[in-house]
UniProtKB/Swiss-Prot annotation:
Native source species: Chlorobium phaeobacteroides (strain BS1)
Function of the protein: Produces ATP from ADP in the presence of a proton gradient across the membrane. The catalytic sites are hosted primarily by the beta subunits.
Enzyme's top EC category: translocase
Name of the molecule in the record: ATP synthase subunit beta
Record EC number: 7.1.2.2
UniProt keyword Cell membrane, yes or no: yes
Cellular component GO terms, alphabetical: plasma membrane; proton-transporting ATP synthase complex
Amino acid sequence: MQEGKISQIIGPVVDVDFQEGGLPAILDALTVARPDGTKLVLETQQHLGEERVRTISMDATDGLVRGMPVINTGKPIQVPVGPNVLGRMLNVVGDPIDGKGPVKSEKSYSIHRPTPKFDVLSTKSEMFETGIKVIDLLEPYSRGGKTGLFGGAGVGKTVLIMELINNIAKQQSGFSVFAGVGERTREGNDLWEEMKESGVIDKTALVFGQMNEPPGARARVALTGLSIAEYFRDEENRDVLLFIDNIFRFTQAGSEVSALLGRMPSAVGYQPTLGTEMGELQDRIVSTNKGSVTSVQAIYVPADDLTDPAPATAFTHLDATTVLSRSIAELGIYPAVDPLDSTSRILDPNIVGDEHYNTAQAVKSLLQRYKDLQDIIAILGMDELSDEDKLTVSRARKIQRFLSQPFFVAEAFTGLEGKYVKLEDTIKGFNEIIDGKHDDLPESAFYLVGTIEEAVEKAKTL
């Protein structure tokens, strides 16, 4: 084992001198024994000459001093993978943080792995049902595809991702991996407790590097989660679900260390390597002819600006986008999905079928027409509209409310029982509203219900 010495510490960035035997390779893990007996992992980032490397620390650098010995492990960070990580909670370097003792895993993977070769990639397009009306109808998710949930602060990204975990993990008996990247520790704790209660925990591996962690951990924890998912895909030939909350924090962590590594910032102060870092992560989240990785990623939108480089870079990699809108959240419609801004590559009659496609397009055109009329309504009022437009507005407002839905994970807040709506019920319900079967029902009957039958029942009580 090569041994070096710490020569400089600048926050999370540590420089190490290696006198003889050459330098560790880029991305190799180095370890430092702390005075309290714990081990700190550093990741090599740059060679600063013939004897010095610059590294990023995966944990706080408190207590480190110059001259401390550093050992080169000779390989990148290795994390435990396999069936034994299910039901466990790990940190970025694969150490357990759930207090249940060490993970007894026979195999470990590097967190930096090559992308699968082109000839083994799968090109199948198939929709998978989430039980959430607005998603299944207007921006269906594909099995083995990548989906992004975009939204500013406090519009419901984490609640939506929790609901998806709840619906998908319970309905489909596959394995899931959850990577908590730079988000609130409280939310991670809630998820852990909720999973234990619902019994989903035995099929899930959780990897956390939350807000309180140094940027090195936040920049790498998504890769740790991905390596665990890749094991199930490649060696057990399974369909795996990978949830990442939040991809923006991955970019943000990269930007935090970029300047300390001596790089010139690029647009809006982000790291110049933004596109490469995002590409290296997203390019590994693929499906092969052995198994699939279906990923759902929450993506924070700084100041509600979708053109910010961080969300804009993520957009290009996704198969479906669910955009959460503050204006819809203000109307009290949850999930606050913007039906006109959200997209999906598989909303195609050849994949989802003609009925689904036509219903989705009819819903979108009604909502678009309502949006166009809103200026007239605001200035002149409803009375100035033609009878046809009044009917359009009435149906569009019903559709808007029918796109809301009570969530299982939000039962404590709404006091309403969560609903899982099957795709055929979703299509049937929206078709009936478009065809005018429910023109006589009040708008409020459609708010926070599951199927159209529930809306009819609710109308009787109003």
